[in-house]
C-alpha cells in the first residue's frame, strides 16, 4: 500500500431501512484522492458579511438571507434584485419584519418560512410576501419545506432533532434521536445543534454541527431514519478525540461556559440524485445517495484564498457556495472522478 492510500480513510456507513431495523455497518473503499476546487466567480456582489443562506425559488429566482436584515432579498437569474420577503408594504405590519434571520426556505409556490432567531419565532410568508403565521420558538436553527404543505424545523431545545409542522403552525410529528454525550444538559444542547437540507422526494438530512464525529442523518418525508453517514476513521479521529476531551473538561465545572468547536461547516444535497456534499472546514466531500464517498476537494476562491463553506446549494450544472463574510461563489460541479 502506498503512502497516499494510507493517508485517506473511508467513512463508515450505517444504513437503516424505513422500519429502522439495523443492518451491518459497511466500510467504504479507501479514498485516495483530494483535488482543488476553484471558484469561477462571485455572485450577488452586494451579499457579503452576514450571509446566511441562498435558495432557488419559482421562475429561477434566487432568495438570499443575510443577518441582521429585515427581509429575505429576491434576485432574478441575472443577479438583479427584484423584491423582498416580507414585501416593502407588508414589512410595515407589526412583527412582519425580520429581527435576526438564521435560516429559511422557499417552496415551489413562493411561500417562505424563516427561522427568526432575534424574534424567537418561525415566520411564514405568503407568495405575495405577507406574513401569514408566526410560531413562537425559543431557538429555531434551521428549516426546510416538505411535501404536503409541511415544513421541518431543527431546534436544540426540543425532545427530538426535527419537528414537522403544517402551514398553520400545528405540530404533525417529531423525529430523530438526540445525542447525549455529556453530563451537562447545556453541553448536550449545543451538541444537538444542527442544520437541515431536503431533496425533491421530501427526504430531509440533519447534520450535527458540533458532534465530535462528523455525522449526517437522512430521514424520509415521514421521519423514518433511512441512512446515517458517520465519519469515524483515521482521517477524522484526531479532531474527534480533541473535541471529546474538550467536552469532558466542560463537565468538570459548571462555571465553564459551553463553547464547542464547529465540526460540519455545511451540507448540500442534489435535489434529484440525492448526492450529498459535506464540508468540514475547507474539505468538501461528495457522497452518492447510498452514502458511498465519491470524491474530496479543497475549496478555493478565484484568487487562491481558501473558502470554508457555510452553505452549499447544489444545482444541475454547478455548486453555489456561500460563506460569511466572503459572500456567494459559483463553483464547477465535477462530473468525473479524479484519476
What are these regions (language model features)?
Residues 20-27:
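Boundary at the C-terminal end of the N-terminal hydrophobic targeting segment
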Amino acid at each position: 500500500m502506498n503512502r497516499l492510500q494510507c493517508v485517506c480513510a473511508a467513512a463508515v456507513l450505517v444504513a437503516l431501512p424505513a422500519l429502522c431495523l439495523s443492518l451491518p455497518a459497511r466500510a467504504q473503499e479507501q479514498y485516495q484522492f483530494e483535488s482543488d476546487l476553484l471558484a469561477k466567480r462571485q455572485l450577488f456582489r452586494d451579499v457579503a458579511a452576514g450571509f446566511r443562506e441562498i435558495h432557488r425559488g419559482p421562475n429561477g429566482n434566487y432568495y438570499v438571507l443575510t443577518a441582521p436584515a429585515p427581509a429575505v432579498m429576491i434576485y432574478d437569474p441575472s443577479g438583479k434584485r427584484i423584491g423582498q420577503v416580507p414585501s416593502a408594504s407588508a414589512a410595515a405590519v407589526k412583527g412582519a419584519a425580520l429581527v435576526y434571520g438564521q435560516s429559511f426556505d422557499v417552496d415551489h409556490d413562493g411561500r417562505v418560512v424563516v427561522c427568526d432567531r432575534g424574534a424567537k419565532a418561525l415566520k411564514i410568508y405568503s407568495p405575495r410576501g405577507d406574513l401569514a403565521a408566526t410560531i413562537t420558538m425559543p431557538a429555531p436553527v434551521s428549516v426546510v419545506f416538505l411535501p404536503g404543505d409541511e415544513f421541518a424545523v431543527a431546534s436544540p431545545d426540543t425532545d427530538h432533532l426535527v419537528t414537522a409542522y403544517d402551514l398553520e403552525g400545528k405540530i404533525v410529528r417529531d423525529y430523530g434521536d438526540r445525542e447525549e454525550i455529556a453530563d451537562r444538559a447545556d453541553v448536550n444542547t449545543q451538541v444537538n445543534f444542527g442544520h437541515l437540507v431536503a431533496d425533491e422526494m421530501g427526504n430531509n438530512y440533519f447534520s450535527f454541527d458540533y458532534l465530535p464525529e462528523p455525522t449526517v442523518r437522512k430521514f424520509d418525508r415521514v421521519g423514518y431514519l433511512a441512512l446515517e453517514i458517520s465519519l469515524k476513521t483515521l482521517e477524522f479521529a484526531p479532531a474527534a478525540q480533541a473535541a471529546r476531551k474538550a467536552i469532558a473538561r466542560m463537565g468538570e465545572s459548571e462555571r465553564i461556559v459551553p463553547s464547542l468547536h464547529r465540526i460540519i461547516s455545511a451540507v448540500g444535497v442534489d435535489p434529484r440524485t440525492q448526492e450529498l456534499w459535506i464540508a468540514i472546514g475547507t474539505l468538501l466531500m461528495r457522497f452518492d445517495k447510498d452514502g458511498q464517498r465519491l470524491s474530496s476537494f479543497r475549496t478555493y476562491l478565484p484568487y487562491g484564498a481558501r473558502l470554508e463553506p457555510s452553505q452549499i446549494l447544489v444545482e444541475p450544472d454547478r455548486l453555489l457556495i456561500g460563506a460569511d463574510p466572503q459572500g456567494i461563489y459559483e463553483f464547477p460541479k465535477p462530473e468525473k472522478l479524479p484519476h
